[in-house]
Amino acid sequence: MSVSAKETQRHPARPEPRPGVLAISAYVPGKSHAAGVEKVFKLSSNETPLGPSPKAIAAFQSAGTNLQDYPDGSSTALREAIGKAMGIDPDRIICGAGSDEILNLIAHAYVGPGDEAIHCAHGFLVYKIATLGAGGVPVVVPDREDLQMDVDAIIGAVTERTRVIFLANPNNPTGTYLPFNEVRRLHAALPPNVLLVLDAAYSEYVRRNDYETGLELALSAENVIMCRTFSKIHGLAALRIGWAVASEAVIDALNRIRGPFNMNAPAIAAGAAAILDAEHVERSIAHNDQWLSWLTTELTALGLTVTPSVGNFVLIHFPKTPGRTAAEADAFLTRRGLILRAVASYGLPDSLRMTIGTEEANRLVVQALSDFLSGAER
């Protein structure tokens, strides 16, 4: 046998990723195009219809004149702006290229082979991806029938191997939330070595007296981290800006494994301007308050079930009856240039998630669904 033949037998024919990597289902974002449609309304990714703050745009453009320079590796200006807006020490803050990066950093810092990370059945898909990417074992906890997260079930799923609990509050794609006394009850039941991750990406939209973001808990507890994003209410999804606050020990661990220049300079500048523009945020909240209520009422009047939402989206449930299913509604809406998010990958095959859009988009969706349910061909 030739030497090359022996080598082929001894080694794989190509580099192979470590076990488990190819078993990960890659994240698939919401659709953004509709073939053959002149005007498209993208309501699939929970982007704000009002766009970013004009001050953020100006800061982004100004920072773009120095693209030859490396950014500040510590994102100092952004952390200081967040600290000023939130009243917290910038040293307790870490910034990332979207909260996705921070979620992955958490998994890689605290979850190893054989370790368990808990997430809810209808939670953000990145939790499972991050856990598997770190070599860990995702533990999926079922939600209640009303799609509310089940604190008792989460507590019951904790074992000696549990290292992290990912909890989106509010949750995407359901729009449900946990009152903060329930979050505190969950935290009180955890061993001190289990890190509770509070993903508050949609927190700015919540208008409930019993809701809290988790900021105070993250500042006072050693095993809590609260994550936030600039992609939603701040309208900076294209720039990928996320941040988190936690104990000094947790922030130190994450900083040790993040990239040395993980935030680009225009993003740092735009984010710093955006978070200090409270008036723009209030306009976005007011728009969402108006149209979230209107859409929920109008869609319910069509005979559809809508899960009560505190976010900038609604989860619409369709019957299994042929001609009236979620998949058929999705195709019908797409033909009209109205792109919603199919959420079968979240375990909700009979539902569509709709972002609160402009007045025009919102009214068009309601009319289109009325036509669909009445049997119109297009």
From Swiss-Prot:
Biased composition range(s): Basic and acidic residues: 7-17
Organism annotation: Azorhizobium caulinodans (strain ATCC 43989 / DSM 5975 / JCM 20966 / LMG 6465 / NBRC 14845 / NCIMB 13405 / ORS 571)
Matching CDD domains: AAT_like
Gene3D superfamilies to which the protein is assigned, alphabetical: Aspartate Aminotransferase, domain 1 (3.90.1150.10), Type I PLP-dependent aspartate aminotransferase-like (Major domain) (3.40.640.10)
Catalytic activity, EC: 2.6.1.9
Gene from which the chain derives: hisC
Alphabetized UniProt keyword annotations: Amino-acid biosynthesis, Aminotransferase, Histidine biosynthesis, Pyridoxal phosphate, Transferase
Modified residues (N6-(pyridoxal phosphate)lysine): K232
Assembly mode: Homodimer.
PANTHER family, per the entry: HISTIDINOL-PHOSPHATE AMINOTRANSFERASE, HISTIDINOL-PHOSPHATE AMINOTRANSFERASE 2
The protein, known as: Histidinol-phosphate aminotransferase
Ranges for region Disordered: 1-20
A GO term for molecular function: histidinol-phosphate transaminase activity
GO biological process: L-histidine biosynthetic process
EC class of the enzyme, as a word: transferase
Pathway per the UniProt entry: Amino-acid biosynthesis; L-histidine biosynthesis; L-histidine from 5-phospho-alpha-D-ribose 1-diphosphate: step 7/9
Catalytic activity: L-histidinol phosphate + 2-oxoglutarate = 3-(imidazol-4-yl)-2-oxopropyl phosphate + L-glutamate
Required cofactor names: pyridoxal 5'-phosphate
Family classification: Belongs to the class-II pyridoxal-phosphate-dependent aminotransferase family. Histidinol-phosphate aminotransferase subfamily.
